[in-house]
């Protein structure tokens, strides 16, 4: 049974129920390379979005929102990419001509800005075609790796990853053999907590199956949709 007593009372940072907020666990990670997250406005409002969590977890990151009903509200993506003149910009997108990210890193003589579109498959395809500045960027692909641990949505494509998982794998390549795995693990660790707390709030994960535990405040959330009395069980 769902534990979502007050679904509107969510942290504006991590989007979790206030009692489950994990913002205090997010310590921005320093990286040599930079992330530019281009997120669709509809995706930015979803509580299961992982791209914004990745952005909060990386110190060197820009977030640009597009796809508003009024185009004048969209952020200037092309302008942001133009400001990144000191870095090479590449687009993480599975185009037919996408090159392995590792090859691009091997050729680079300085920092890279990884541009990541965030939305549904249809939205990201449209973003690439229509957002000024994106279509001209060379596309890069990720190496093979473990299957997704994102159990909050159905993946439309076999082998698909959440946005955060894709960013984590990309930065494992970007940051090199020593720092890369550390960055990847830092991102995936906060992601695992996010997924676990969301599943618990939905009533899809029992207390006994929790790996990372819950904040004390969460123990007062009743599985019947209210606030439990002190000492009540929530399992």
Go through each PLM region and give its residues.
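Short, flexible, mixed-charge glycine/proline-rich loop motifs
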Residues: 1-5
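S-adenosyl-L-methionine/SAH cofactor-binding core of RNA-modifying enzymes
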Residues: 59-129, 133
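Cys/His-rich microdomains that often coordinate metals
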Residues: 18-21, 25
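Short metal-coordination and nucleic-acid-contact micro-motifs, chiefly zinc-binding Cys/His arrays
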Residues: 7, 17, 31
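Short cysteine-rich clusters marking metal-coordination/redox-active sites
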Residues: 11-14
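C-terminal folded domains that constitute the principal catalytic or ligand-binding module
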Residues: 113, 121-235
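Histidine-anchored nucleotide/phosphate-binding helix
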Residues: 46-57
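Short hydrophobic beta-strand segments
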Residues: 34-41, 88-93
């Amino acid at each position: 049974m769902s534990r979502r007593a007050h679904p509107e009372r969510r942290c504006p940072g991590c989007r979790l129920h206030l009692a489950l907020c994990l913002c205090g666990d997010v310590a921005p990670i320093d990286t040599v390379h930079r992330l530019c997250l281009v997120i669709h406005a509809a995706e930015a409002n979803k509580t299961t979005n992982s791209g914004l969590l990745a952005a909060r977890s990386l110190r060197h990151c820009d977030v640009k929102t597009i796809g508003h009903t009024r185009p004048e509200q969209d952020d200037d993506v092309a302008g942001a990419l133009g400001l990144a003149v000191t870095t090479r910009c590449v687009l993480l997108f599975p185009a037919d001509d996408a090159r392995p990210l590792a090859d691009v890193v091997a050729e680079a003589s300085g920092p890279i800005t990884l541009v990541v579109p965030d939305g549904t498959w249809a939205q990201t395809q449209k973003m690439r075609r229509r957002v000024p500045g994106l279509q001209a960027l060379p596309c890069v692909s990720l190496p093979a790796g473990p299957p997704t641990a994102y159990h909050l949505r159905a993946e439309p494509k076999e082998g698909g990853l959440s946005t955060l998982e894709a960013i984590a794998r990309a930065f494992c390549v970007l940051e090199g053999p020593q720092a890369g795995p550390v960055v990847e693990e830092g991102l995936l660790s906060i992601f695992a907590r996010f997924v676990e707390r969301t599943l618990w709030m939905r009533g899809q994960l029992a207390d006994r199956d929790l790996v990372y535990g819950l904040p004390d405040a969460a123990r007062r959330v009743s599985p019947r949709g209210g606030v439990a009395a002190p000492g009540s069980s929530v399992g």
